[in-house]
C-alpha cells in the first residue's frame, strides 16, 4: 500500500502525521527561498495581471536544482485534493490534464486537521513513480504558478518522498521544504544551496547543521583504524595470539575473556 509506505516515511522523519508548516514540525529540515528578486507580474497596473516569465523561470530553476540534488530520486508522489471545494473526479481530471499523469495507483479518502484544529474532507492520490513516466519540472512549474495565475489546487498539496527517508515539498512560488531522517542525509543540500536558505529560518537551520557531533573514539593497531571496540578487540586478539595455542599455556578462550573483561569463564591450558 502506497499510503502505508508514505506514512512510514513520515514516521521516519520524526513526525506522527503531516502537519503544516512542515518545516516547523520536523526535527531535521531545510526551508529554501524559491522566488527571486524579479517582479512577479509584468504590469501590476494592468486590468489583468500577467505573470513575469523571468520570475517563474528563476523559481523553477531553483526548485529543479534542489530536486536534482536530492539524496535519491523520489519514488512516491502524493497529491491532496479537497472534495468540499471540487468533486474528487474533477480534481483528478485537472491533475491528470495538467501533469500528464496516469490514473493514480491509490486513491484514499481522509480527514485533514488544519493548524486551527478544524477538520476538512480530503482525498489523497498516490503514484508509484518507479512505474510511470514522470516529468518533475512540469509538476514544479504548476506548483509555482498556483498562486500567481495557475491552478491553486497544487499549492501546499504536493509531496514527493524517497529512500532515507526524505520529503520534498514545494509549497508555492515562494518556498520549498526538504525534510530528512538525519542531518547527515541533508548535509550536502545544506552546503550546496546554503545561499538559498530562507533568511528568516537561517539561524535555526545553521544551528542544526553546524552543531558539534560527538567524536567516536578511534583505535589504531598495525596501521588499521577501528571506530568501535568490537573490531578493535578482534584485531588485538588476532595479533597477540597468532601462533600460540593451549599447549604452551595460552588458551584463546581464556585470553578472550581477559581482553573483553569477562574473567573466569575459561582456564588457561583448557583445550579449545
Segments from the language model and where they lie:
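N-terminal intrinsically disordered, low-complexity segments enriched in P/E/S/T
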Residues: 211-246, 250, 254, 262-272
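A short, acidic, amphipathic alpha-helical segment used as a generic capping/interface helix at domain edges
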Residues: 150-164, 254-263
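Extended, low-hydrophobicity segments enriched in charged/polar residues
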Residues: 1-150
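Alpha-helical oligomerization segments
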Residues: 159-211
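Acidic (Asp/Glu-rich) sequence patches and key acidic residues
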Residues: 107-114, 119-123, 127, 227-237, ...
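Glycine-rich, often proline-containing surface loops adjacent to acidic residues and nearby aromatics
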Residues: 38-47, 74-78, 120-122, 169-177, ...
